[in-house]
Amino acid sequence: MTELATVLDRFAFAYLATIAEQRRTHIVAVRPVLVGNTFRIAEPGRTTCRNLGQQPAVTLVWPPSDAEHYSLIVDGIGRLDGHDLIVAPTRAVLHRPAPAAPTDTPTACRSDCIELPVAKDG
């Protein structure tokens, strides 16, 4: 989680994605705070809370400051703690489009990704 904490300084805010019962994605802008091995999001809205009751899997996406930089994508499990949302990360990756280059196979990855270690004891 040390690498993740260091990387977070590059970003101003994130988008939180939750899934509704009808499999519709709900996305809101948030300012997650890393506390130990989890993210704390203050006072999520009623739709986010309702979605968490149906599906606790969430994704946080910190957009890059420009197209040349990485986005940070964190998948996790969310739960409510009083008026806050707690997200325990299950996967974290820095992601950006890779420069155009020929690939040997049609299934080759065409992105520039860096996996970041996350604690599994959330």
Indicate where each model-derived feature is located.
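Short, basic/aromatic recognition patches
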Residues: 1-13
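Short, charged low-complexity intrinsically disordered segments located at boundaries
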Residues: 3, 35-38, 79-84
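Sterically constrained small-residue positions within well-ordered secondary structures
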Residues: 7, 23, 32, 51, ...
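Short, cationic low-complexity segments
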Residues: 102-122
